[in-house]
């Protein structure tokens, strides 16, 4: 395994956990691997350590190339900054897919809690014109995840929202709350999704 640290923006860093090239694995390494970008939770106030290395190593052991995103958090979590960070990460992984031996059509996002909200946000807002402009691309397909794994995610900004998470990423105006109520944004262009919760999660 080799690890690379890749600055994305003023407040965001992408850490890559990549399979090392070796004589024993060279034939296997010639095959492109799927990849996954992990977004830890933390209420958009911090990125939780417990949702970083453990899932990263698990996915790496499954044969994936793995990336962990430290995205912009409060007080820099407004104005779609975390979403832009994740979109930039997706764009970077796609653009360097040959170098990193990644199948550019098999790049998933995985998020935990508020990180699940972030991952799902890219799943429904990957073609947001403002985010595309900030990423310097007119090709929305570069930013679209091929699949999503949402782990006990924050989803709604409506009546039953996780208040501290949504307060850090959204304003109180109706337009903003509707934008971040992801259950209302699902369409036929939303990527295939595996979503799971636990019965003991009171949030």
Q: What is each PLM-predicted segment?
A:
Residues 156-157, 200-203:
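Acidic catalytic loop of the alpha/beta-hydrolase fold
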Residues 30, 49-67:
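Short amphipathic alpha-helix adjacent to the substrate-entry channel of hydrolases
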Residues 48-49, 69-104:
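Catalytic nucleophile-loop/oxyanion-hole region of alpha/beta-hydrolase
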Residues 1-31, 83, 158-163, 187-191:
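N-terminal cap/lid segment of alpha/beta-hydrolase-fold proteins
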Residues 88-166, 173-178, 182:
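Primarily recognizes the serine-hydrolase "nucleophile elbow" in alpha/beta-hydrolase
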Residues 35, 60-70, 108:
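A fold-wide structural signal in alpha/beta-hydrolase
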């Amino acid at each position: 395994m080799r690890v690379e640290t890749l600055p994305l923006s003023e407040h965001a860093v992408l850490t890559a956990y990549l399979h090392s090239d070796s004589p024993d694995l060279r034939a296997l390494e010639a095959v492109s691997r799927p990849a996954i970008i992990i977004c830890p939770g933390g209420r958009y106030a911090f990125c939780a350590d417990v949702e970083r290395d453990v899932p990263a190593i698990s996915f790496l052991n499954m044969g994936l190339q793995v990336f962990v995103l430290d995205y912009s958090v409060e007080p820099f979590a407004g104005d779609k900054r975390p979403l832009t960070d994740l979109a930039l990460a997706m764009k970077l992984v796609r653009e360097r897919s040959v170098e990193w031996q990644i199948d550019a059509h098999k790049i998933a996002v995985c998020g935990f809690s508020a990180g699940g909200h972030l991952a799902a946000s890219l799943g429904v807002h990957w073609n947001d014109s403002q985010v595309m402009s900030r990423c310097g691309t007119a090709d929305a397909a570069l930013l679209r995840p091929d699949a999503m794994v949402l782990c006990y995610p924050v989803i709604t900004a409506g009546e039953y929202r996780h208040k501290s998470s949504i307060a850090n990423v959204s304003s109180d105006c109706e337009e903003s709350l509707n934008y971040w109520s992801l259950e209302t944004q699902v369409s036929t262009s939303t990527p295939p999704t595996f979503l799971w919760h636990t019965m003991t999660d009171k949030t």
